């Protein structure tokens, strides 16, 4: 605000000996507007003090005179010389104060800050950091400003064996504008934190490009194969990813149609594993030819379990009894449900370990996956309990009794997210013609592999062939959290003979499918398109939570198809042959190695 003490047009060059961070070409420069305080000969603090004192003094004088005229019935328009002087002083002080303080506020709303308006103090701190830095080469920290070496093409050493990968591409850097080049050098030197580029530049794509180039210069490694163009970086700002330098391309295959609950679905699967989409597609074909699959949603509730500590185990038990008392549930629900109109507390489960109490809250979350929603509700309850339990020490909003992104028996038994069971009856003819195996062989293999074999391995929720394959592929395609594949893939696959032993009954039971159709990565363009393909894009307008529940049943139905096909391939001895045919690189490694040796010699 003080133009004589802190000028927004002072450049970094004057402060740190470097070029200023100029705005991108095409951006307008912020005009330098004079202020009333610049024309006064007094120091700024004296000028402000004089006009503040003058304003309040004449205001007090005029109000006093106004009250006296009212008491004496004197006309208000009759003024004395002193009153005229007071009015003039009031107007002058108002003009000064408004021009000094008011214009700054208006200008901050009208004029967008540019790169030259960055705070001089921040640039001085950056210079100090660069002087004090030692061997730090991280993008977000300060490093000494060494001269940037020229990056030569990366050439691998002469190998001793014939197995050679393709020659890496040389480090090709695009032509940057002069102002971008200055910013890149400042990031490399550690004078500008890489994480602040988006907020400073106001252009997410430009920030990603500058960060990418700085990363290449710091590491000496090329990112030529990592695409930068063709992505909306503003869509991930503050939501999906920090400090982006590009995006990874993943192929998306389509399996189906999957006939589930009387409706057909085409399944988008993002994967780099050959045979996975083809195998799932074969399972869908067998299910479709047998009349389809049916699903049942058993539970729908996201959980969060904070951990609190008391001075004694007795005191912790008192809170446990209070939380699990049904008479107190309504009170707790009212406090919890304030977090969102979609949040509805379902249950509270407590566990004690010494003086520590773990409180597992479960609530419905609409069409969102719901982790943030349930966490907000838990925070509300903890603040409410603090009144009656002031000795309660909240150690963490999550105490791993939830349990999130970890294989846990509590999820396997109690469920987390959506609990779904999906089943189908596969006709004997389809088992023979499409799956190329026998019903009896499938049942025996399922028992010795998925049940007995998993038990011998000590599996926790892993009584299946490859549920994780299908879950992760659909999760990535539809913008779910891939890390929650850990508990979402917990599945037990059951097979038995029906209809006098002729047909096969197959089912998958999945107690912890954690999905959502709003929030997180679901709002990205590619992932949103995949959700739209399934008919579950966004929030359900008719019934909150219907889209996320439908997505969970589709995931379970897809797992059913994948389990059916893989188990059939193993039973028929086709697994190795199919993977050798479809899951190997088509590149001739020997020819690549020979050409590589010739080019290097």
From Swiss-Prot:
SUPFAM superfamilies attached to this UniProt entry: NAD-binding domain of HMG-CoA reductase, Substrate-binding domain of HMG-CoA reductase
Glycan-carrying positions: 337, 583
Region described as Disordered: spans on this chain: 1-34
Disulfide bonds: none
GO BP field: coenzyme A metabolic process; isoprenoid biosynthetic process; sterol biosynthetic process
Membrane topology annotation: Multi-pass membrane protein
Pfam families hit by this protein: HMG-CoA_red
EC number: 1.1.1.34
Source organism superkingdom: Eukaryota
One cellular-component annotation, GO: peroxisomal membrane
Catalytic as annotated region, ranges: 180-601
Catalytic reaction annotation: (R)-mevalonate + 2 NADP(+) + CoA = (3S)-3-hydroxy-3-methylglutaryl-CoA + 2 NADPH + 2 H(+)
Main location: endoplasmic reticulum
Compartments where located: Endoplasmic reticulum membrane
Transmembrane segments: 36-58, 86-106
Signal sequence interval, chain numbering: none
GO MF entry, a single one: hydroxymethylglutaryl-CoA reductase (NADPH) activity
Pathways involved: Metabolic intermediate biosynthesis; (R)-mevalonate biosynthesis; (R)-mevalonate from acetyl-CoA: step 3/3
UniProt keywords, alphabetically: Endoplasmic reticulum, Glycoprotein, Isoprene biosynthesis, Membrane, NADP, Oxidoreductase, Transmembrane, Transmembrane helix
CDD domains according to UniProt: HMG-CoA_reductase_classI
Record flagged with keyword Transmembrane: yes
Active site per database record: 273, 405, 481, 579
Family indicated by similarity: Belongs to the HMG-CoA reductase family.
Function: Catalyzes the synthesis of mevalonate. The specific precursor of all isoprenoid compounds present in plants.
Stated name of the protein: 3-hydroxy-3-methylglutaryl-coenzyme A reductase
Organism: Catharanthus roseus (Madagascar periwinkle)
Gene assigned in the entry: HMGR
